[in-house]
């Protein structure tokens, strides 16, 4: 019997990463319907991940994974935070706005945060959160990734997320870490649920 797992996102970058990270788990991983949208009304990444997972599960009748993630910059009090995707109209505008906000700032510490919720219709089964610390550069570097990847430097690698190959990024990223937490204790095609 095939077991379907719906990814509650239409963000193509997240979708591709989640598909790669969940490959080989025994689940048939599918995107949410093309018109799927959830208003992100949560005040935390975890709340938004939960909203997305529950909405996708209700809509499709299948187990669903909701991901909410973003960048929290120390000198900006954690901004853009849950508003990371809405910090501008596109990646270039978001990066420009963030770099302008950090002009003259010595403290450029930041962290990418990823919250993931697994839900079936009517209830959340498991929730995890992970992060990756780094530094915001003064200018973009690298051609890979998406979002804020070109300005997020991982100090121990001396590379931005945009300079990492897929395997390296998945090993070090907030999303890779969160998916590994989600899958911990799982066997093929099953999840160990919290509730």
From Swiss-Prot:
GO cellular component, one term: cytoplasm
Gene3D superfamilies membership: 3.90.950.10
Function noted in UniProt: Pyrophosphatase that catalyzes the hydrolysis of nucleoside triphosphates to their monophosphate derivatives, with a high preference for the non-canonical purine nucleotides XTP (xanthosine triphosphate), dITP (deoxyinosine triphosphate) and ITP. Seems to function as a house-cleaning enzyme that removes non-canonical purine nucleotides from the nucleotide pool, thus preventing their incorporation into DNA/RNA and avoiding chromosomal lesions.
Catalyzed reactions: XTP + H2O = XMP + diphosphate + H(+); dITP + H2O = dIMP + diphosphate + H(+); ITP + H2O = IMP + diphosphate + H(+)
EC number(s) from the headed UniProt entry: 3.6.1.66
Subunit: Homodimer.
Organism per entry: Gloeobacter violaceus (strain ATCC 29082 / PCC 7421)
Name recorded for this polypeptide: dITP/XTP pyrophosphatase
């Amino acid at each position: 019997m095939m077991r379907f797992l719906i990814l509650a996102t239409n963000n193509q970058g997240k979708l591709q990463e989640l598909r790669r990270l969940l490959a080989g788990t025994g689940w048939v991983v599918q995107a949410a319907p093309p018109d799927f949208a959830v208003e992100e009304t949560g005040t935390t990444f975890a709340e938004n991940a939960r909203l997305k997972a529950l909405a996708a599960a209700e809509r499709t009748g299948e187990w669903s994974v909701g991901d909410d993630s973003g960048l929290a910059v120390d000198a900006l009090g954690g901004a853009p935070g849950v508003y990371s995707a809405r910090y501008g109209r596109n990646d270039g505008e978001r990066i420009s706005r963030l770099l302008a906000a950090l002009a003259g700032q010595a403290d450029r510490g930041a962290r990418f945060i990823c919250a993931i919720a697994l839900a079936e219709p009517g209830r959340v089964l498991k929730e995890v959160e992970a992060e990756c610390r780094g530094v915001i550069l003064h200018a973009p570097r690298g051609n890979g990734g998406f979002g804020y990847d070109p300005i997020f430097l991982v100090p121990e690698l001396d590379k931005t997320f945009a300079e990492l190959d897929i395997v390296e990024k998945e090993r070090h990223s907030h999303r890779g870490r969160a998916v590994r937490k989600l899958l911990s204790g799982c066997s093929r095609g099953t999840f160990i649920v919290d509730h």
